[in-house]
């Protein structure tokens, strides 16, 4: 269930593909390859493989199939890696009618229909195609246990309750691709109260049934895997709160787009650091720190800089030929370390700057208190003071009011007081947004709470899992991390085979039928959590920690239609019809 292993397997399959021409006909030139991508697979490759890794396999040219100005290079072998969309297929058909390269080996990132294959064959008059193969990576791998489809709600929903036709097809196909890449045929559970979850669950089940003999004929496992489909709006608090761990803070305050961090707007940033790559697969320091809170991160950065200084001093002692030889041997590693130190110093410095200028320390503490406590007078008083503070940005005032409304829907007098202050502090469109937000989530069914509500005391597993976030602790860390995302309780319930049956319906993919409130027989070993409406990096941290706690007894992968920052989540609500 390691997504990086999935990526390596498929990328290796593409780049090591052998020519179908006879060995005698393969000259030096034909060993050199061109990789032809489309707009969908270009980011997939960039997330999973570096340029140097491609060069190792004699791929010296990477091109886009949409580019009609490519030169004719018949001496080159072309590895095509594209998504089987109608748009890409049209480009591919044109390519084969007038081939620019000597040989084509085509890899599709998802299932190809029989009619698509027939159209390809009809266009290949010169028999340039020597291989067509389906591989299954129609999604973006961000962490070893996190994936995204990088789709915004406007791209897949007609309104907040109804799928668009194209959006449903995209999400279904990509989710099927995830299942095939992990080689699992799961039972599907979904939030019964959510129409969009129900529709997606049934579409995925239909696709599994349709392709059962061709693609889903996997060996029977000891316990049936589970695909759990969730609706983002059943836990609106988590994506509203300011995050405090490294990866999630970078996404919140700077932005991470497919592993690229844009630092160009950071004051006095070095030109070489304006755009940097941040990948836990390739950056050991980031892999070690991505889930640390800001306090722990500071200590790690200091250690990292100290290590760099020590290596610098060691390498600077060049008094002999042997020293020069050693320096030259170590220089690539030293240079890489030097660049990495500068990158992380720049990122951490910018995070610290933004925390200060935006008053995040004060805002976040109140956010956490509002999310953790119901109808607390002291919290309300602190909220009013912050709303009336001219130094606090209007965006954070609106967000704080929304957070308060989620836990205090029955406090009508206080809500009225809140609206009065918002009307004085915010523009009319923001006040209207607050009313829209309050209306949207006031109808939220209380059954979204897990069955652990009946027993307030978490299991020992959950207690260990969430020990750092225990709100009774007085440490600074816990003040800013009191809120426990709902995914935590769902994981605990799954690990005990105790999902709330009145909330989650189940489709048995063996019989392709909804089986309602029946108790499943076994605790699943492999679980995919998929959230329609997006997931947060804070939830990704919880899943990662949970996997570590379970030590392979249960393996969880988290995915969503997108990765959310607080602003992106609020924007999605603002634009919802």
Swiss-Prot record:
Q: What is this protein called?
A: Vacuolar protein sorting-associated protein 45
Q: Which gene encodes it?
A: VPS45
Q: Which family does it belong to?
A: Belongs to the STXBP/unc-18/SEC1 family.
Topological category with respect to the lipid bilayer: Peripheral membrane protein
Cross-referenced InterPro entries, in alphabetical order? Sec-1-like_dom1, Sec-1-like_dom3a, Sec1-like, Sec1-like_dom2, Sec1-like_sf
Describe the function of this protein.
Essential for vacuolar protein sorting. Function in membrane traffic between the Golgi and the vacuole.
Quaternary data: Interacts with PEP7 and TLG2.
Q: Name one GO biological process term.
A: vacuole organization
Q: Where can this protein be found?
A: Cytoplasm; Vacuole membrane
């Amino acid at each position: 269930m390691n997504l990086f292993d999935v990526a390596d397997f498929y990328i290796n399959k593409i780049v090591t593909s052998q020519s179908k021409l006879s060995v005698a006909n393969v000259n030096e030139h034909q060993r050199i390859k061109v990789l032809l991508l489309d707009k969908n697979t270009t980011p997939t490759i960039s997330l999973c493989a570096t340029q140097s890794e491609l060069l190792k396999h004699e791929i010296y040219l990477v091109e886009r199939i949409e580019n009609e100005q490519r030169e004719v290079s018949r001496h080159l072998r072309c590895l095509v890696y594209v998504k089987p969309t109608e748009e890409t297929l049209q480009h591919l058909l044109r390519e084969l009618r007038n081939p620019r390269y000597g040989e084509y080996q085509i890899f599709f990132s998802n299932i190809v229909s029989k009619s698509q294959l027939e159209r390809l064959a009809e266009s290949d008059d010169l028999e340039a195609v020597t291989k067509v193969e389906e591989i299954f990576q129609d999604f973006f791998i961000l962490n070893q246990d996190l994936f995204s489809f990088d789709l915004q709600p406007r791209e897949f929903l007609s309104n907040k309750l109804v799928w668009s036709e194209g959006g449903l097809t995209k999400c279904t196909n990509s989710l099927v691709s995830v299942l095939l890449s992990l080689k699992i045929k799961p039972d599907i559970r979904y939030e019964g109260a959510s129409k969009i979850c129900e529709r997606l669950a049934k579409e995925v089940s239909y696709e599994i049934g349709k392709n059962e003999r061709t693609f889903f004929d996997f060996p029977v496992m000891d316990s049936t895997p589970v695909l759990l489909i969730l609706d983002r709006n059943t836990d609106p608090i988590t994506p509203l709160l300011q995050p405090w761990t490294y990866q999630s803070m970078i996404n919140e305050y700077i932005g991470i787009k497919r592993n690229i961090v844009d630092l160009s707007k950071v004051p006095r940033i070095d030109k070489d650091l304006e755009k940097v790559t941040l990948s836990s697969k390739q950056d050991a320091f980031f892999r070690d720190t991505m889930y640390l809170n800001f306090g722990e991160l500071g200590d790690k950065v200091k250690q990292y800089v100290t290590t760099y200084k020590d290596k610098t001093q060691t390498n600077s002692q060049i008094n002999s030929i042997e020293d020069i030889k050693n320096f030259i041997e170590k220089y690539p590693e030293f240079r890489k370390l030097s660049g990495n130190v500068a990158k992380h110093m720049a990122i951490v410095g910018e995070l610290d700057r933004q925390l200060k200028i935006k008053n995040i320390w004060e805002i976040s503490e109140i956010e956490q208190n509002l999310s953790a406590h119901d109808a607390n007078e002291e919290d309300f008083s602190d909220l009013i003071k912050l709303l009336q503070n001219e130094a606090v940005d209007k965006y954070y005032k609106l967000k704080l009011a929304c957070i308060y409304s989620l836990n205090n829907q029955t406090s009508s007098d206080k809500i009225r007081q809140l609206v009065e202050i918002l009307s004085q502090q915010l523009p009319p469109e923001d006040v209207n947004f607050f009313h829209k937000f309050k209306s949207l989530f006031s109808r939220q069914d209380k059954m979204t709470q897990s069955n652990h509500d009946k027993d307030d005391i978490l299991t020992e597993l959950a207690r260990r899992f969430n020990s750092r976030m225990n709100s009774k602790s007085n440490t600074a860390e816990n003040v800013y991390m009191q809120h426990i995302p709902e995914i935590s309780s769902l994981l605990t319930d799954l690990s005990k085979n105790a999902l709330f049956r009145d909330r989650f319906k189940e489709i048995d993919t063996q019989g392709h039928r909804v089986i309602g409130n029946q108790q499943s027989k076994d605790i699943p070993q492999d679980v995919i959590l998929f959230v329609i409406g997006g997931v947060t990096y804070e939830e990704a941290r919880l899943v990662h920690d949970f996997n570590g706690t379970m030590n392979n007894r249960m393996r969880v992968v988290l995915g969503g239609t997108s990765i959310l920052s607080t602003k992106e989540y609020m924007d999605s609500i603002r634009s919802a019809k």
